[in-house]
A protein has these predicted regions:
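Hinge/lid segment of periplasmic solute-binding proteins
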Residues: 102-160, 188, 217, 297-299, ...
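Short, low-complexity disordered leader/linker segments with a strong preference
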Residues: 1-39, 62, 123, 421-424, ...
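Extracytoplasmic/periplasmic solute-binding protein
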Residues: 143-156, 161, 171, 185-234, ...
Length: 434
């Protein structure tokens, strides 16, 4: 599955493979007859694609006088959005189009009253009945499918974790900026050398309200986030491999070479030239390149020696929650627009996310040229063969399970418990919930 998924996404981003795709520009077909207002919920802050969201919404509204899209930013990433969404659904005030994080896919399918897109399209927009086949390949659609194969949304944003670094700090520390760390052993060594030679902090790994990059380091060391025992999903991270990976991060913090802080603090330290390396999503590329006081450079997510690199596909997919027929029709027009090659090229350029559909790499607005000229994008694309699915805790307690593992991160990185202790205790708690 991993190789097929990687091949698909490489193909979707490669101009050499696709020369075009089915059109999604029939926004007027099956259009809305009266003025309809819909809400679009997202997690794009001002420094993480928020400006691009506003531009896309404004462009859509200008082209569709009978539809008014109101965008709403939800803080605390996908956990915060999902919690807000639950409250909205409970009060009967559903948003219409929602960016749902991949790690909440199973939870959303089992616990949120979403609108099934495929039968809705068949009924209200039959001219788009082949949208899925024309726009995406089967394995790409599978990203937004539950474990039992139910399609609950449409792929939108694809990201991978990468290692951004400051070449000026590398040079000052006696490191070669053209030969960045390839393994975690080299990351630890580089972080120590940066601190000793320059006084700057060496390393920071993002601390969003999720476990995305932590999954990458755990599974790249041979561990697992989840396991299936007798048909039941359980926590899989109570292993020596997972503990060793997490302890490596904690030891860097303990030794004074790694940073345990909020994202705002960590990212600002990097952008202001006071941090050598930051491990985070390629989705931060555009903001970093615009805001940094130095040339931003990226390297692939580090490996463990002799072990296979595994990076979870980050980002989000689009779900529909409209119940009113007019809102459903309007929401579908908006989804088609933001999934169009032109809009996706703007979204990818304004963020760093990789496009999930055919044709975007050949977009006349220049994303093809950007891929060819931007080495940081090329770095992200190079890790596509190592993609795995972002682990998603199932069941009604999935959100609570996710939060327990987030809490364990703080316990481990603050040195309150060893990684082995914290992961063992957390696994027991999660298994009692699932």
């Amino acid at each position: 599955m991993k190789k097929k998924l990687a091949a698909l996404l490489l193909a979707a981003a490669s101009a050499m493979v696709f020369t075009g795709c089915g059109s999604s520009d029939n926004q007027s077909k099956g259009g809305v007859d009266k003025k309809v207002q819909i809400e679009y919920w997202h997690v794009a802050s001002e420094s993480f694609g928020g400006t691009t969201v506003k531009e896309l919404v404004a462009d859509f509204n200008a082209k569709h006088p009978n539809i008014q899209v109101v965008e709403k930013y939800n803080p605390d990433m996908y956990k915060g959005l999902t919690q807000n969404l639950q409250a909205a659904i409970a009060s009967g005030k559903n948003p219409d189009v929602v960016q749902m994080g991949w790690s909440y896919l199973n939870y959303a399918a089992e616990n949120l009253k979403y609108t099934d897109l495929q039968p809705m399209i068949k009924k209200m927009a039959p001219e788009d009945k082949n949208f899925w086949k024309e726009i995406y390949l089967p394995n790409c659609l599978a990203l937004a499918q539950t474990d039992d194969g139910k399609q609950i949304g449409i792929p939108y944003s694809i990201s991978v974790p990468v290692l951004f670094y400051n070449p000026e700090i590398f040079t000052a520390a006696g490191l070669d900026p053209n030969n960045p760390p390839k393994t975690w052993k080299e990351v630890v060594s580089a972080a120590k050398q940066i601190k000793e030679k320059t006084g700057n902090m060496g390393f920071f790994m993002q601390e969003y309200a999720d476990n995305w990059t932590q999954q990458a380091i755990i599974e790249s060391n041979g561990g697992s986030m989840l396991k299936n025992e007798g048909g039941k999903v359980k926590a899989g991270f109570d292993t020596p491999e997972a503990a060793a990976a997490y302890q490596l991060l904690a030891d860097m913090v303990k030794d004074g070479n790694g940073l345990h802080a909020t994202n705002e603090e960590g990212f600002q330290a990097y952008l202001s030239g006071k941090l050598g390396m930051v491990c985070t999503t390629i989705g931060k590329r555009a903001n970093f390149e615009k805001s940094a006081k130095f040339k931003v450079m990226a390297a692939p997510f580090p490996q463990f020696e002799g072990k296979e690199l595994k990076v979870p596909a980050g980002g989000n997919f689009l779900m529909l929650f409209s119940k009113d027929a007019d809102k459903q029709k309007a929401a579908w027009e908006f989804i088609k627009y933001i999934e169009s090659p032109e809009a996706l090229a703007k979204w990818s350029t304004g963020t760093g996310y990789l496009p999930p559909r055919k044709g975007v790499a050949d977009d006349p607005n220049g994303f093809k040229k950007m891929i060819e000229e931007n080495k940081n994008i090329q770095v992200a694309l190079s890790t596509m063969p190592n993609l795995v699915k972002w682990a998603s805790f199932p069941g009604a307690n999935g959100l609570q399970a996710e939060q327990l593992l987030i809490d364990a991160r703080d316990i481990i990185l603050s040195g309150k418990e060893t990684a082995a202790q914290a992961l063992h205790e957390t696994a027991e708690k999660i298994n009692n919930l699932l």
